[in-house]
């Protein structure tokens, strides 16, 4: 037996099938295997793109979802129910803010003069660079964005300086230009760190959106520079704009199974910090081996998940990408690297036009604490089963290699 060679691709093939069995728990393994491998053959025959590009087509094939992803979580699967969905309020929220929501529609049209803080050309360039990836600004039209940039002011900070303190009234929203900052939450007289900002990101929006005290303390751990936006301008432009976005997204967010363990107020906070991105056919959304910075929920379209094979190479001698999953509307991906703090375990490509709701890593850590247990147990469940049956978990620990 020691001289028997395992054919190239056999391990990956069986791992994909095994994961689907674990996920779907079919009553008849033989019928399920026939259907699974038939669709696998059909998917392969329809693939017509080069090896390194995402396959095209519309097959409903999902041979490895939940395994990597940045693997996918199937909105139709019952995994979350089997994993004891946390009861709202049972787990310690990283941020728990409950208050009456500010309603922009009830506020009279403002007649206050626009706030303008003069800036040099060099300052303006630095500000634009710092704000280019801020999701709260993504849905602003050019005139609104210009007003926001005009109103922002620069603030330099020193080591150990408290930028905001838990329990204080919210006065400003902050965008980080440079510096590192700890996020501290105090509960039952115990203070703990729940995250860190590293030279990019933003904070302070929740207190301004919901008329509530600051939910966390932000302390500078290095010298740094911030751009602040006053409360009045933030509410006049950002909050009103987000109210329109909320009407568009709230029903969709409520339909995502993963988020059903959250309270209504928490789901609304997700709507307020989430952004929308559109991808064209074949466009790469995330890249295997890269650092993770966002979490994705598919609003419309189809996404192909691929990993680099260790046994297949393309004509250039590089590891060939192999499709292991397809995910659709309501499914999410990109969470594995955020939960494990590892590089991306897979790449994701748009199949046709795709629209995703995107949450940055800071908002993910801050708002999805109650869901983290489900995601971690999903990952552990698949890894344990794969190690037990195959002796490995397809290098989820070090996916970039």
UniProtKB/Swiss-Prot annotation:
Keywords: Acetylation, cAMP, cAMP-binding, Cell membrane, Cytoplasm, Membrane, Nucleotide-binding, Phosphoprotein, Repeat. Residues 43-65 are annotated as: Disordered. It comes from the Eukaryota. The modification Phosphoserine is found at residues 48, 75, 77, 96, 347, 392. 3',5'-cyclic AMP 2 binds at residues 258-401. Transmembrane segments: none annotated. It is found in: Cytoplasm; Cell membrane. Residues 2-135 are annotated as: Dimerization and phosphorylation. The inactive form of the enzyme is composed of two regulatory chains and two catalytic chains. Activation by cAMP produces two active catalytic monomers and a regulatory dimer that binds four cAMP molecules. Interacts with AKAP4 and CBFA2T3. Interacts with the phosphorylated form of PJA2. Interacts with MYRIP; this interaction may link PKA to components of the exocytosis machinery, thus facilitating exocytosis, including insulin release. Forms a complex composed of PRKAR2A, GSK3B and GSKIP through GSKIP interaction; facilitates PKA-induced phosphorylation and regulates GSK3B activity. This is cAMP-dependent protein kinase type II-alpha regulatory subunit. It comes from Bos taurus.
